């Protein structure tokens, strides 16, 4: 995630130069990186909270995870899809995000047509999950802080490489090559 986050930071800096008010939208999902490196083998809380914490530490702006939350944790089964969306929404809200993008249970998995019932299923699941957590929070394991530090130092390394080379795409290629060896 550190390469993506470095790219988002660069885009935010460009947005600020254009007098925009950029809002980072980190993914709360199960991505190939997490799968390959086993970052979510134990739970989905630590990595997602670590990613949100990195943003909250390095930028003074609202954080809005999405596209949608829970991406790649959904299946075609509507109840499961609504449930994973609701769990991710509760996790995001307990971490203090400003907003989160959700998708209806049929759209979340297939990006297909959205039915009214699927939309209602997901909204009810999110409502119940938020009510369940209330003012409580999820308790990350000690691994969360280690992941956060790893992401943060990875972002710094990427930005240093980009500054040295002066070319974002070439820098990412160099970083990818050095990580695979």
Which role does the model predict for each range below?
Residues 1-181:
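Anaerobic metallocofactor- and corrinoid-dependent redox/one-carbon enzyme cores
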């Amino acid at each position: 995630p550190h390469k993506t986050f470095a790219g988002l930071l660069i885009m935010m800096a460009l947005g600020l130069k254009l007098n925009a008010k950029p809002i980072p939208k980190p993914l709360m999902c199960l991505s190939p990186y997490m799968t390959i490196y086993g970052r979510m083998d134990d739970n989905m809380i630590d990595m997602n909270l670590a990613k949100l914490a990195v943003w909250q530490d390095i930028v003074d702006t609202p954080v809005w995870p999405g596209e949608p939350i829970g991406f790649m944790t959904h299946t075609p089964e509507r109840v499961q899809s609504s449930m994973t969306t609701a769990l991710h929404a509760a996790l995001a809200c307990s971490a203090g995000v400003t907003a989160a993008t959700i998708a209806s249970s049929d759209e979340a998995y297939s990006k297909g047509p959205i039915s009214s019932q699927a939309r209602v299923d997901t909204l009810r699941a999110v409502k119940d999950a938020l009510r369940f957590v209330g003012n409580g929070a999820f308790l990350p394991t000690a691994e969360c802080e280690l992941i956060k530090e790893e992401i943060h130092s990875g972002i710094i390394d990427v930005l240093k490489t980009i500054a040295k080379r002066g070319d974002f795409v070439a820098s990412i290629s160099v970083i990818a090559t050095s990580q695979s060896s």
